[in-house]
Amino acid sequence: MSSIAEQLAAASSLNQVTVPDLWQQEAVTALRAGKDVVVQAPTGSGKTLIFELWSKQGKNRGQAIYTVPTRALANDKLAEWRARGWDVGIATGDLAENLDAPVVVATLETQKNRLIRGDGPVLLVIDEYQMLGDADRGLNYELAIALAPPQTQLLMLSGSVANPQDVVKWLIRLGRQAVLIRHEHRPVPLDEVFANNLNFAVPSSVRGYWPRFVTKALADDLGPILIFAPRRQGAETLAADLARQLPPPPHPLDLRVDQKQMVGEHLAKLLRS
């Protein structure tokens, strides 16, 4: 007969329990007290869990709009929460579905007119709020925050803002009650490497900063490599340049049909080349 400890360990419901850290509990407590919350915490530390706890796993009273910078991120969140059985809608530039759901994942620009009308949700989540500093989209983010009606609480999440305290001061100047929750521990270590310290001799046939840098990094076994570009066109141009100049891998990637549909035919061809 198994011990009580073994029975508890085998209980699937217990294996799925997530116990929030103190900083996450503080953020949820502040939200439930009616305050705006600005969260500064590293990637992978559990910022999204704050919203999930506040919403009681998608069973929140009143609507919450969870905004993300890109349509791809919106689709990811939609799929994740629907897989858990949540009633979730989506609003992006090219898709609007189930907009009366308790939780709607959206790009922020789709909500601007609603906020201007004063028709805000109970909670507006701005994930990756460092977009305030974006040269092209920052104005839309600033307007959305400044025009959010008093009855709409704000939850602003980021891991890459150097001065979150100034954002809190700005919210207070707007007449809002705002607090800063800061968490410094990084669950995924981050090491900085200077490009000049990579000593691999790149062949002269490889030209341009990024192709030469990626060649050096791969030679030092620093892959996989993820490069961010401000726009899709820039990302595709860079991907094409890298695919053209870097030596091909011994086994080009053979994507499944669903993977080809996800990345698009253009990028699928690059991966095969």
Regions found by a protein language model. Name each.
Residues 1-40:
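Conserved pre-motif I regulatory segment
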Residues 37-40, 65, 155, 226-228:
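Short hydrophobic/aromatic beta-strand immediately N-terminal to the Walker A/P-loop
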Residues 39, 46-56, 137-142:
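Motif I (Walker A/P-loop) of helicase-class P-loop NTPases
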Residues 61-113, 169, 179:
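Conserved nucleic-acid-binding Ia/Ib motif block in the N-terminal RecA-like helicase ATPase lobe
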Residues 65-67, 72-78, 82-90, 233-273:
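Conserved C-terminal RecA-like helicase domain
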Residues 73, 128-132, 163, 234:
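Residues immediately C-terminal
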Residues 108-110, 116-155:
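SF2 helicase catalytic motif II
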Residues 143-147, 152-155, 160-248:
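Conserved interdomain linker/interface between the two RecA-like ATPase lobes of SF2 helicase motors
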